[in-house]
Amino acid sequence: MESTTLSKPFKNQVNPWGPLIVLLILGRVNPVALGNSPHQVFNLSWEVTNEDRETVWAITGNHPLWTWWPDLTPDLCMLALHGPSYWGLEYQAPFSPPPGPPCCSGSSGSTPGCSRDCEEPLTSYTPRCNTAWNRLKLSKVTHAHNEGFYVCPGPHRPRWARSCGGPESFYCASWGCETTGRASWKPSSSWDYITVSNNLTSGQATPVCKNNTWCNSLTIRFTSLGKQATSWVTGHWWGLRLYVSGHDPGLIFGIRLKITDSGPRVPIGPNPVLSDQRPPSQPRSPPHSNSTPTETPLTLPEPPPAGVENRLLNLVKGAYQALNLTSPDRTQECWLCLVSGPPYYEGVAVLGTYSNHTSAPANCSVALQHKLTLSEVTGQGLCVGAVPKTHQALCNTTQNTSGGSYYLAAPAGTIWACNTGLTPCLSTTVLNLTTDYCVLVELWPRVTYHSPSYVYHQFERRGKYKREPVSLTLALLLGGLTMGGIAAGIGTGTTALVATQQLQAAVHDDLKEVEKSITNLEKSLTSLSEVVLQNRRGLDLLFLKEGGLCAALKEECCFYADHTGVVRDSMAKLRERLNQRQKLFESGQGWFERLFNGSPWFTTLISTIMGPLIVLLLILLLGPCILNRLVQFVKDRISVVQALVLTQQYHQLKSIDPEEMESRE
């Protein structure tokens, strides 16, 4: 832009089609698709870059994504590093002290080699950044009423701003492109992402410049639309030009967000979902040696990552420890079973006292990388946020967050179950900006408890239950222990809570593996990840079953436990217990029952020929009697027939009484 009287307006030009175009653009913007919990804390760095994309100023903090919008205060000369030659910083390195000697009138006094021209009248030459005197002139220009600077947006501008040009004109090829700055016409915009102004007043900047330091600090603030944008990771660009007589010098600067803890790296190669199917680690005894031991420094090797078997066995062992110390009568002899189908975990809503933190605690940065859903929550506990009516039955107490930015950390042994997933701590900024809600829960693995009689009957097949027995899960047996155990005054209070730490550690490790499986499946086959995930735990349990570590009971993988602990080789223990029951059963049988139990083929043979033998014996025993009866019956009928035949062939003579004849005579 050349300096002419008519070419420099005193107000911003407004495009009447601007609002409509902005709405269309916003309708097409897609937010960054991150699978993290919105409450997870990341290490965020807002960076201001020069034209070469070098970071010249940065500010870092630990906050949830899209909740931290600090004021950026880079120096104007820092933005000109490696810029056009008229700034005088072509060879200046980022984050280095400013070049040139200080002014002799500075607070440090007259030093050798100081510049005495700082007291001379300001000239009309182009202000530069290579000396303290030039930086002082630049400060006067940026604060002058009839001068100043203006800023034009880069590629994120709307389509109607095509006439604004590109980097060669610092995106300010025509008037009306400027959206912010410090100039007499007060440029502004309703759609740009930032506003830029001076950070220091003219009176504050003058002594700073004379002491040979960076003295042209700017204040960059995010607008409401800028806070809604989620494309800061790739960065946005602006052009800045000074408003002076003659040619307006300019520079290019950018703003970007750097997330240093954005989650696991994307693997290259085969799907790593089943890469951890390692056999369980067995304790090894040290080799025997007759040599004299020599003193060597003790070095502890790092433990290898737990395989599937170790991870699941630790889950069962933790469940046993917690159950044994709270209900020892239940662990005289029992079977603890892992289910192969989801849900793998269930929550119990509890009341607890969370802690407030003005800065993000350490556990806020280690949240799960994927939004894990807790599909089964029971009980009533503490709720935070806008809880819908469908979930208010889980709330015994509901607390609303007040204004301000702070963090709510869940008590030890608990976790926040939110509609956005599981998280160890909450950001009130996220809760106030959204309609999220969370319930404080204890997390229990879905481990079912079975009595030994039920398990043995299932394998012996001697009898059938008329109805399925009630499955007791760990949540039913131990629910509320973490927050309610001590308050209720149970006898095992402190000891039981200490025992739950092992279970919590196992739960944490297993949840990380489940989350890793979801992430890997999502990256490899998004459409099938939900289906394949249901088979993941089934595959894990299949490895345990094939290795003889557990007994398969319907859809469960069961581990034998008694007061000695969880038996690792559960299949061998099952065979041993079944053999014992078989011997006990046989000892109470007679010789006839033992005869049938001795040989399977003999039992089959007897059952096959028993019917024909019984029929033959009945014929031999009852046949003669029946035959005699039949013969006698036939003879009687023949005699009757013969009598009838004789009666038909002969007639009986009529007898005459002699006395009757004499009387007639």
Swiss-Prot record:
From the UniProt entry, list the residue stretches annotated as the region Fusion peptide. Answer: 470-490
Q: How is it modified after translation?
A: Specific enzymatic cleavages in vivo yield mature proteins. Envelope glycoproteins are synthesized as an inactive precursor that is N-glycosylated and processed likely by host cell furin or by a furin-like protease in the Golgi to yield the mature SU and TM proteins. The cleavage site between SU and TM requires the minimal sequence [KR]-X-[KR]-R. The R-peptide is released from the C-terminus of the cytoplasmic tail of the TM protein upon particle formation as a result of proteolytic cleavage by the viral protease. Cleavage of this peptide is required for TM to become fusogenic.
Q: Where is this region: Disordered?
A: 266-307
Marked site: Cleavage: R467, E468, L644, V645
Chain ranges for the short sequence motif YXXL motif as given in the UniProt record: 650-653
Reading the lineage from the top rank, the first entry is Viruses
- Side of membrane Cytoplasmic, spans: 627-665
Positions in the Extracellular compartment: 32-605
Q: How does it assemble?
A: The mature envelope protein (Env) consists of a trimer of SU-TM heterodimers attached by a labile interchain disulfide bond.
The molecule here is called: Envelope glycoprotein
- The organism encoding this protein is Radiation murine leukemia virus
From the UniProt record, report the name of the gene that encodes this protein.
env
